């Protein structure tokens, strides 16, 4: 059992308290006084223990494309640069490239990612080998996977390990024909399960869908029954008031990817409007080919900054709400209700924020500091499922240089 003492704790109510926290096995055992003696003591030294970040949308294995094809609009980037390289990917590549992404997540205080990509067997193996938590979903489209494979994955990976789970999904309306979309809708009905996909990312995507079906992607997919049990829409940039009414009615998560949307010039999601309407918000980075970082601090700051610019209002969004979205919101979006907060009985997915870094001083408002001036530099420790995987700039239990070598080797073959 590990005892965390002598520091701040961000409680389940998102309040700063000063209490001891005991972690036994993979879970938070006790907050406050405990009669049992700890096996080891972690002296927080005045730092902050808080729930980890959860990356609610990414394509981890796309590390191969980082700074390989930049400064292009989305469709050109996908069609001319990404899809041809993805066609060359082998299953082992997914393992090696994902491992690289997992290391980067840990440096950003991320304990779990929501990943849409190919070869889920390799993704699950990499995640389990490292001890990282991964929620997977299907990238089903007109060119890969099938309704049967999605159902097989859904059944297999929801009983694979404590660290792995699987959600129904498909790539996007514009890459997936109506019959396949209907097939996913039937699976959602069969399992009473939410569905996740890219939606409303670019203006062109929305306009093309209106030409095809006479309505926006949100309204079309809702008509197809995709959101009968909720789900999530990655990006959610070009959304109308009618779309947002569907989000609210169906409990659809708006999964915001500010860095990727800015870099690809896709637009700015109306997060402030969504929050005012009571729409669920989660935060992800998107993939390392389009962002190009897997950094939740950058995402939080970009959301705050772009909302203020877009609304011409310095008080447009509350940074504390954005911090909640990156932790609790993203966890709930991913179905990770058992590791969302620092509370007894919850899984021990925890991070330590170094309050002794210059960017975190002076201490006026710790939580606002995390959003406005925080960076990876302030992550002192990342714990996943009760195991410390990253601490003081070092990865525990893995050979980082070997992971870098294998990822570079896979990338060189795809060029």
Tell where the protein language model's regions lie, with residue ranges.
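Alpha-helical scaffold segments that flank or form the walls of functional sites
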Residues: 66-131, 151-160, 407-413
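Active-site gating loops and adjacent loop-to-helix segments of metal-dependent hydrolytic enzymes
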Residues: 64-96, 130-138, 203-230, 250-253, ...
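His/Asp/Glu-enriched, well-ordered alpha-helical/loop segment
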Residues: 223-230, 272-357, 373-376
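Divalent metal-coordination and catalytic microenvironments
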Residues: 7, 21, 26, 46, ...
């Amino acid at each position: 059992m590990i005892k965390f003492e002598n520091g701040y704790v961000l409680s389940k109510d998102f309040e700063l308290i000063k209490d001891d926290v005991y972690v036994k096995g993979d879970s938070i055992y006790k907050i406050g006084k405990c009669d049992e003696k700890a096996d080891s003591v972690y002296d927080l030294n005045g730092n902050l223990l808080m729930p980890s970040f959860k990356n609610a949308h990414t394509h981890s294995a796309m590390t191969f494309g980082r700074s390989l094809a930049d400064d292009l609009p989305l469709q050109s980037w996908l069609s001319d640069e990404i899809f041809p390289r993805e066609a060359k990917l082998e299953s082992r590549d997914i393992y090696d490239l994902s491992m690289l992404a997992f290391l980067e997540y840990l440096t950003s205080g991320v304990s779990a990612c929501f990943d849409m990509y190919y070869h889920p067997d390799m993704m699950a193996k990499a995640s389990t080998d490292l001890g990282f938590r991964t929620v997977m979903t299907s990238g089903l489209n007109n060119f890969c996977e099938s309704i049967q494979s999605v159902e097989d994955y859904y059944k297999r990976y929801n009983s694979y390990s404590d660290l792995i789970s699987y959600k129904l999904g498909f790539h996007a309306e514009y890459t997936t024909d109506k019959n396949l979309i209907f097939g996913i809708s039937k699976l959602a009905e069969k399992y009473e399960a939410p569905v996740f996909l890219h939606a409303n990312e670019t203006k062109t995507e929305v306009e093309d869908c209106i030409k095809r079906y006479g309505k926006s992607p949100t309204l079309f997919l809702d008509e197809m029954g995709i959101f009968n049990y909720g789900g999530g829409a990655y990006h959610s940039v070009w959304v109308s008031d009618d779309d947002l009414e569907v989000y609210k009615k169906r409990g659809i998560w708006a999964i915001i990817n500010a860095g990727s949307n800015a870099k690809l010039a896709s637009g700015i999601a109306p997060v402030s409007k969504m929050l005012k309407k009571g729409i669920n918000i989660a935060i992800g980075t998107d993939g390392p080919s389009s962002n190009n970082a897997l950094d939740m601090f950058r995402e939080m700051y970009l959301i705050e900054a772009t909302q203020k610019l877009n609304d011409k209002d310095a008080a447009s969004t509350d940074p504390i709400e954005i911090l909640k979205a990156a932790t609790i919101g993203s966890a709930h979006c991913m179905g990770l209700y058992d590791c969302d907060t620092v509370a007894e009985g919850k899984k021990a997915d925890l991070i330590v924020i170094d309050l002794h870094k210059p960017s975190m001083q002076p201490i006026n408002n710790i939580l606002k500091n995390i959003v406005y001036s925080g960076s990876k530099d302030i992550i002192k420790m990342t714990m996943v499922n009760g195991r410390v995987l990253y601490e003081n700039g070092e990865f525990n239990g893995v050979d980082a240089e070997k992971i870098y070598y294998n990822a570079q080797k896979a990338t060189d073959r795809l060029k």
